[in-house]
C-alpha cells in the first residue's frame, strides 16, 4: 500500500518548486495510484499532482527501481514533439535531501480515469479507445535515432536498469532474463523452471532478430492511466515511468492484456497489425513478459502468494503453447 505523509512534509516538497501561498495548499490522496503515493494539490497557483516514489526497500521489478527519474525528460520530449496530453513536470528532486524518496510535481490534467468513469457508454468508450490509438501512433513516431542520437534498444531512461543494446533481440533477451531473475528471487520459479523459460526464448530468438525501429513505448496504458471528459474525449495519458524504447509489438501485447486494443483503437492507430506466424509467436512471448511480472509484484508488494501462484499457472500454460 502507498504510504501517507503529513501536511507539513507535503507543503515543504511543493514549496521547494512552486511559489504558492502556503495557506492556499490543500492535499487530497489519489486512490488510483498502485505504486507511487500521489496527491492532488490545490493552490493559488493552480492545480498540481505530487507523486512520491516508494522507499528503496519496497519490492521492485528490475526496471522499476528509480524509474521516476526518466519521467521529466520523457514528459518534456512528448510535450515538445506531439499533441499527446501529458502533464508538465514543474519540479522534481531525486537527491533525497527533503524526503527519503524520489518525487516530482506536475500540473494536474483534467478528466476522470477511464476505469472510474461513472456510467460509461459504448459510444464514450469507442471514442476514448480511438483517441488512444491516435495518441499512441504519435508516441510511436518518436524514435531513438532521432531523439537519443542512436538506434539503441531497452530501458534507456535516467534510471538505467540495463545497458543500451544495439538490437531489439539483444535487448529483449536481457529484459526477459532479468525479469526471470526477479521471479526466482520472489520464490515463484525454481532455478530449473526459470532456466526452461530462458531456454525457450533462446530457441525462438531468431524470430526477434529482424530490423526493428526503436520507438518510444508507454508500456502501461490501461484504463486507470487514460483520463477522459464527459464526452469520452481523452484529456490525459499518465504514468510514463515504465516506458522503454523498442518494438511496437510489445506495446500491442500489453494493450491486449489491458483490454485497450479493441477495434476502435486500431481505427485510431491507423495501421494494420502483423498477423504472420512469427509475429504471433513474438506476441506470445510479449504476453508472457507481461504476465510473469505479476508474480514478484503479488509476492513483494501485495503479500499475496495465492494470487502469484495463479499467475505462475497462467505463465506455464502460455509457455506450454510455445514448446
What is the predicted role of each segment?
Residues 1-25:
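Juxta-kinase regulatory segment immediately upstream of eukaryotic protein kinase catalytic domains
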Residues 16, 186-196, 202-203, 207, ...:
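A conserved long alpha-helix in the C-terminal portion of kinase-like catalytic domains
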Residues 28-173, 178:
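ATP-binding pocket architecture of kinase catalytic cores
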Residues 117-122, 157-215:
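ATP-dependent phospho-/nucleotidyl transfer catalytic cores
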Residues 168-172, 181, 214-216, 222-281, ...:
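Active-site Asp-x-Gly
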Residues 31-41, 49-50, 89, 139-141, ...:
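Active-site acidic catalytic loop and adjacent metal/ATP-binding pocket
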Residues 20-22, 82-86, 141-155, 183-190, ...:
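Surface-exposed helix-capping loop/turn segments at secondary-structure junctions
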Residues 51-59, 111, 243, 247, ...:
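Short glycine/proline- and charge-enriched loop/turn segments
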